[in-house]
Amino acid sequence: MKAAGTDTMKNEIKYEKSELELMTTYQLREICRREKIMNGVIHPLDKEELIQSIMRYMGKRQDFFICDKKKEGEERVEEFLKKTRIVIKPCKELYCQSQILAYEGLSIEYYDGYTIPYKKELSGTNAFLMGSDMTLCAILNLKEHGGRQEKLYLTKAAELETRETQRKDYRIFCMGRQTSESLYHLYYGEHTILPEHIEVYSIPLIDFVVRKPVTLMLPMAIDFGSVNTTAGVYLDSAYFENVGEQAAVKNCRENEINYTAFEDGNGESMLLPSVIGVLAVEEEDYKLLFGYDAIRLANASYVDEGFCVFYDVKRWIGEYEKEEEIVDRQGRRRLVKRAEILRRFFLYIIRKTENRFKCRISQVHISSPVKQKHYFRRMFREILPEYMTDQETMLDEGMAVLYNTISNMLEQETLEENEEYEALIIDCGGGTTDLCSYRFRIQDRRAAYKIYMETAYENGDTDFGGNNLTYRIMQVLKIALVRAKGNQNVSSVKEILEYMDTDIYRFIDSHGVKAFYQYLEQEYQKAEETLPTRFADFERYNRSEYYKVKNNFYTLFNTAEQIKKLFYGKVGALEVTVTSEQKEQRENTVLLDKWKLSFWKGNSLTVEKMIPEVMMNYFEIELLLSGEIYGIVQKFMEELYHSGRIQDFSFIKLTGQSCKIDLFKDALKEFVPGRMIQFRKRANIDAADFELKMTCVDGALKYLRDRKYGLADIHLNNGKAVLPYRINAYTHNGKEVVLVDGFKDWDTAGTISRNMEDLILPLYLKNTDGEEHCRFQYVCRQEDFSQKSYEEIEAVYGSHILQKETDSIENGDVKFFVWAEQEEWGFQVVPVYCEMDELYLGKAEFFSFESDNWVNSFFDGKK
């Protein structure tokens, strides 16, 4: 044996779970004693608990894949393979496709279809594609996929280089796990003992081709959602003429929209969870995980072990300049700007798309939120400048959905030329719900359609989305578990639902949504005493208890999300069972990790291994969610209904994944005839259904295609938005003054006066029902003022500060001018002071309507 470097690695024994499961309880205790795992020595643990303890501290890292670029790593491996003695092991049953096609800077994935027959000793190892002159042409990984043991997939990381040789004679060296791990450590420059000779299987390859990726003509489209994000590209004939015959592109559709698929652990999904996890925080950099990988990171953590996962990151748009503290499992911390984290998230999606379609993306169209379109576009310009497309032609989410509808109606020939149509679109996503009105008409010209589109924001709820529905299910799940564990102080789920089983719509009309859920909220708070989930309350406790409670919340919330998908992702799922025991294969079962939940026992939080089985049925969930859904529909539709405006609309379209729940359509029928509602729900829909979520990507790509190919001359216009907020203040004698009224003339400045001192002006953000959301403070100091003439003030602020208003300011007083900024989704405060009949202008300050200070988050540790 020979050593690479001067030191040798400590020879640690690591254990695989499959090996431990074959051992007796006595053998497992002996391992704990030998490895000084005190938890397994002191406490009388059973076999399952002993395996859990050993895997936590001495579990073997399953795979040592070479999957990122390391300086001089390939050179070290190539030099070793050239110099060492290689023994070829005979194995006729191992073979591969005769040719492998790779693309510069792109990965090879399982969907590319390169495989070898399954051989257990090769699973989870590295393989080395060599030229006849022993040039290292590519480093590959051998992976299982989908739990099937029929074949192993050849994959390659995008960061690793590929090269051809002059002679078309290649072979793939496959080797056992121990040899593969040795070369892994050699590649990364770690001190390791290298063998004098290695044994490999040699699989011949006729050709290895490396090509340059095709650059797409049209931008890629991304729909960034609160819960899920989707992406797609339009692949024209030119793409198919230039790309190679990869297995991945054989399934692509020519001159059609193709979606980016993401691996979810069980297969592929067109939906990527908008979740970001922290894998490692190092001195020079940090590593993040995205989507399903981030969720797996949280699920894989031990119950009292730290993890850092960000959900609902779309809310960061409003304050993307802020910093977030990221923490890895080792407790290493770092402050990182939200903009940088979001940039990496979008780059991950772009890279996944490039790898999937063997292409290069030069431009990206990300549909902006309707109410924050200008703010979002500025953020996009800053974080992804290299992918910028023409911002003036970028669609917001509502426009994209509408254009998809128009395009489909043109194909079906159901639109009348020059007739003006009005549409109302309700977009209920994972975190927010928006209501927008649209007007459009078309003209069929000789060369192209001429399409006129106008949009106006009508209403919205920052605090309602699919997460609200998941949270309601989580509340019932938590109460059911607490009752099953013996806490009879909490009412049963049956008792709670019986209380709610009334004429729901009329009850909410009279008493509101909060009153409808009052009993549920009361019992949920009682359940906190047994099964805590408010991890923010544990920040002053020790680290172990904090993470136990944090695990409680995320375990229950993710389980509730699975339950929701089973009920509303499958027709006929009338009952769902939640259990920790994997018994016989039962349909509609959600497995709850028995090592994840901690209950109060006396003064300590104890992990419960025996989790009681809980059953939920469809009718209970319908009753539970009806109040939330009717409440949001009533909020949006009631004013339109009573004013008669609802009759002006040609159709009402429901979009967003949450809208596939029939309860939305039922609630809408209280205000409009059912035939006005465009509600897509197909028979035999399953959990992978994503049609409602894809309408935004479809519309954006059809819009980009029609503009690029001259099929349509499209004119976009933004109408005046309705702002669902009011800004109020109080005069010196306590009289309330409305400074900004979002449902009226909100772009005219409201004013309020004070006597000039170093003063603080409190401002109150209220919703249309008069409920206070947030308080702002404008701090006014004399040194911030500078003398200005009215003409100078007018040059800066125009009609927002009128001369008749400044003329009325008395000496010694300051008048505050407050007006809304639609494009920035916030409001400005500008003070003007008068002294000795001279005007002095103070500093302007902008406040965002929606900020972290008041917007409801289900992931802040207060649920």
Regions flagged by a language model, labelled:
Residues L342, T470-Q475, I479, K485, ...:
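Helical "lid/coupling" subdomains associated with nucleotide-phosphate turnover
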Residues S237-L271, R446-N459, R680-I685:
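Flexible phosphate/Mg2+-sensing switch loops adjacent to catalytic phosphate-binding sites
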Residues V209-N242, E305-C308, K314-R315, L410-E454, ...:
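Gly/Thr-rich phosphate-binding beta-strand-loop-beta motif of the actin/hexokinase/Hsp70
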Residues T24, I349-Q363, V633-F651:
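Phosphate/pyrophosphate-binding loops at sites that engage ATP/ADP/AMP, CoA/4′-phosphopantetheine
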Residues T192-M217, T393-I426, K693-L711:
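Conserved phosphate-binding catalytic cores of ATP/NTP-utilizing and phosphoryl-transfer enzymes
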Residues F65-H191, K485-Y505, Q678-D807:
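Acidic, glycine/GT-rich loop-and beta-edge segments that sit at the periphery of enzyme/chaperone cores
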